[in-house]
């Protein structure tokens, strides 16, 4: 049985009519991520494998308060039809945990939907940029809040990749102070059966 709050913590870590017409419902503002274009002809097979989390641009209060406690984070990606099975590995209190999730198909290459497992709502995911061999930039949106993540196949990443990421963060109306860089060591490669959070089956 998971310790109290563990599932929540891990999940926190990887949206008048005119006269004589019927009044119309006010239009919902466009979702921030709806304007982000996915990688052209995104290929999930090439994207598969291991990715290391380098940095996150986000206004998330949790990161603002706990960013100094960030742990090295690894993403393992495996295509599953038109969806992607994603496992996130990170430490919590010195113990390696695995979080299993399914990035569901949306009918658009490079655009995915992670179904909600709690009241905070679904997560929209866009793989916006990648060369498949060295880096990837992903956008995630939940409840209208956008974040930008930079992943790499290996570390360190080039200055040009970092500059490109920082530019995207700025274009997402986030500031330099809202960029959090993750540790470059201490990555988990596996977790035992007692430290697996399966978001797919819950």
Swiss-Prot record:
GO terms, biological process: complement activation, alternative pathway; complement activation, classical pathway; killing of cells of another organism; positive regulation of immune response
Activity: how regulated: Membrane attack complex (MAC) assembly is inhibited by CD59, thereby protecting self-cells from damage during complement activation. MAC assembly is also inhibited by clusterin (CLU) chaperones that inhibit polymerization of C9.
Pfam families attached to this UniProt entry: Lipocalin (PF00061)
PROSITE patterns referenced in this protein's UniProt entry, alphabetically: LIPOCALIN
GO molecular function: retinol binding
InterPro entries: A1-microglobln, C8G, Calycin, Lipocalin_CS, Lipocln_cytosolic_FA-bd_dom
Gene3D superfamilies, per the entry: 2.40.128.20
Keywords associated with the record: Complement alternate pathway, Complement pathway, Cytolysis, Disulfide bond, Immunity, Innate immunity, Membrane, Membrane attack complex, Pyrrolidone carboxylic acid, Retinol-binding, Secreted, Signal, Target cell membrane, Target membrane
Stretch forming the signal peptide: 1-20
Cystine connections: 96-188
GO CC list: blood microparticle; extracellular exosome; extracellular region; membrane attack complex; plasma membrane
Principal subcellular localization: secreted
Residue(s) carrying Pyrrolidone carboxylic acid: 21
Location relative to the cell: Secreted; Target cell membrane
Function of the molecule: Component of the membrane attack complex (MAC), a multiprotein complex activated by the complement cascade, which inserts into a target cell membrane and forms a pore, leading to target cell membrane rupture and cell lysis. The MAC is initiated by proteolytic cleavage of C5 into complement C5b in response to the classical, alternative, lectin and GZMK complement pathways. The complement pathways consist in a cascade of proteins that leads to phagocytosis and breakdown of pathogens and signaling that strengthens the adaptive immune system.
Subunit structure, interactors included: Heterotrimer of 3 chains: alpha (C8A), beta (C8B) and gamma (C8G); the alpha and gamma chains are disulfide bonded. Component of the membrane attack complex (MAC), composed of complement C5b, C6, C7, C8A, C8B, C8G and multiple copies of the pore-forming subunit C9.
Cited PANTHER family: COMPLEMENT COMPONENT C8 GAMMA CHAIN
Record-given protein name: Complement component C8 gamma chain
Organism: Homo sapiens (Human)
Gene that produces this protein: C8G
